[in-house]
Every structure is written in C-alpha cells, then in structure tokens.
Amino acid sequence: MYAIFVDGGRQYRVEPGMELDVDYRDIAAGENLKFETVLAVGAEDGLKLGAPTLDGVSVSASVLGMSQDKKIYIQKFRRRKHSKKRTGHRQKNTRIRIEEIAGV
C-alpha cells in the first residue's frame, strides 16, 4: 500500500516504514506528525484518487531527528568594479518515518 500526500508544496509517494526528509519543523525527535492532504492511495484492489484530496485519509509519521542538505554557494560578481561576494546556505530538514496510512 502506498499514498501520495502534499507537504510544503511538494508531493511525496510513501509506504509504511519508509524514511524521508520533509521541510523543517520545530518538533522534538520521537513526536508524531499527521499529514491530512492525501491526494491518492494505492493498494492491491486499485488506486483511489481524490478530487483534489481524499476525505478521512491521513498519513501518520514519527520524527527521527533533524538534518541538513549539502551546502550551496551563491556568488555575486560586479564587472569592472573589483567587487565580488560569495555566501553559502544549508537548508534544514526534518527526518521522518512513515508509520501508517489510516482511513483507507
């Protein structure tokens, strides 16, 4: 069984027991999250599609911890001015494990 849900403007295809990174949330490790905007659920008996979401279906997950993406560098260069600037950014993520797909 799998589900497709929306979080932070991105769609994730998940199955129970799967681990993935979602946008950062200020939640301690060990706490639970619930995603209610489920677009589709697939099982042995077929695919259920929402219009646009499925009512009563949710994906529950537990928080494993925090992580960060690789560092990206941004460079600004002004021609003929002997001026340049280089900065970096690391995006924070929350690592979760999918526990169950409820309401199917």
UniProtKB/Swiss-Prot annotation:
Taxonomic superkingdom: Bacteria
InterPro entries named in the record: bL21-like, bL21-like_sf, Ribosomal_bL21, Ribosomal_bL21_CS
Gene Ontology biological process terms from the UniProt entry: translation
One cellular component term from this protein's GO annotations in UniProt: cytoplasm
GO MF annotation, one: structural constituent of ribosome
Listed Pfam families: Ribosomal_L21p
Keywords on record: Ribonucleoprotein, Ribosomal protein, RNA-binding, rRNA-binding
Record flagged with keyword Cell cycle: no
Quaternary structure note: Part of the 50S ribosomal subunit. Contacts protein L20.
Family affiliation: Belongs to the bacterial ribosomal protein bL21 family.
Function: This protein binds to 23S rRNA in the presence of protein L20.
Name the record gives this protein: Large ribosomal subunit protein bL21
Organism: Rhodopirellula baltica (strain DSM 10527 / NCIMB 13988 / SH1)
Gene: rplU
